[in-house]
Amino acid sequence: MNYPFWIQNFNRITNYQDKYPLALEIFKHPQSFWYGDNPKKPKKHMEKSIQRLLKRAHPQLPVLVSYNIPNRDVGQYSKGGAKTEERYLDYIERFARGVGDSSPIIIFEPDALPHSTLLSEEDREWRLSLMKQGLEILTDNCNGIVYIDVGHSDWLPAKDVGELLDRISNPKVRGFSVNVCNYRSTDESIKWGKRVCRFRPDDHFVIDTSRNGKGPLESEWCNPIGRGLGEPATTKTKHRVCDAYLWVKIPGESDGKCNGGPKAGMFWGEQAEELVKNRLVC
């Protein structure tokens, strides 16, 4: 896989150069673009936003993230998502129309699959069915390279992940994503991803390396202190089944109101500078 990652070319210097000068290093690297859904916006707002992004990025392509599953984040810091099945499937249809014939990487619903194990049996079956329908709509209506998010290496056994993927995936899905928004090391993530591939031999995977330069702080996942930037985005992973290292989580964006951080998704300059100071030197 040879993928030309796009670095967003807008100028953030005026926002951060005075107070958080070290944070500017983050914006020299390709990052991802997350899409939920805002029912207050016009129906075609997200579709047009994706189309504009793809046009600006051409001939390079960005990494997109669909993040709107009902009961998103199971009520935690990033809670939200579509209110009904109908609204979710409509969101996926509009997302797919936005992508169209382009072929960006698409990370499908971070944490939604492993979070299904926390739900009641009835709610779990409903979520898996909804994800399966969403994936069919997505892969039938756009040319995106789709990876289903499966959590990180310290969450579920590889066999359980394989069984969950069997329930929802389809032949047009490229594979799965590992370590999105987490801090597990690249080596650990590669080993775990390969174990999952034993149960899904046709799959490939990508790893979020945005904040794993120092690895995890024990089991802390919400704004752990002392972490660092990981390997920059690349397709040169030296592992046949690992397609790419990506910065899926935008470094410097908070995990939530924990350990001194602002609400989830807000830029936190102090953390951003800490990540840069502790970055992995390749």
Tell what function each PLM region has.
Residues 1-98, 250-281:
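N-terminal carbohydrate-binding/catalytic regions of secreted carbohydrate-active enzymes
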Residues 32-33, 59-63, 103-107, 143-147, ...:
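Structural preference for beta-strand elements that scaffold enzyme active sites
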Residues 67-71, 105, 155:
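Glycoside hydrolase catalytic-domain context in secreted enzymes
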Residues 50-54, 92-96, 131-135, 162, ...:
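Generic structural signal for well-ordered alpha-helices
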Residues 73-78, 110-122, 146-152, 177-183:
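Active-site-proximal beta-alpha loop/turn segments in soluble metabolic enzymes
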Residues 2-27, 153-273:
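Surface-exposed substrate-engagement region within the catalytic domains
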Residues 55-58, 97-100, 135-143, 166-170, ...:
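Sec-exported extracytoplasmic/periplasmic mature domains
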Residues 80-102, 110-144, 158-160:
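Active-site cleft segment of glycoside hydrolase catalytic domains centered on the general acid/base Glu
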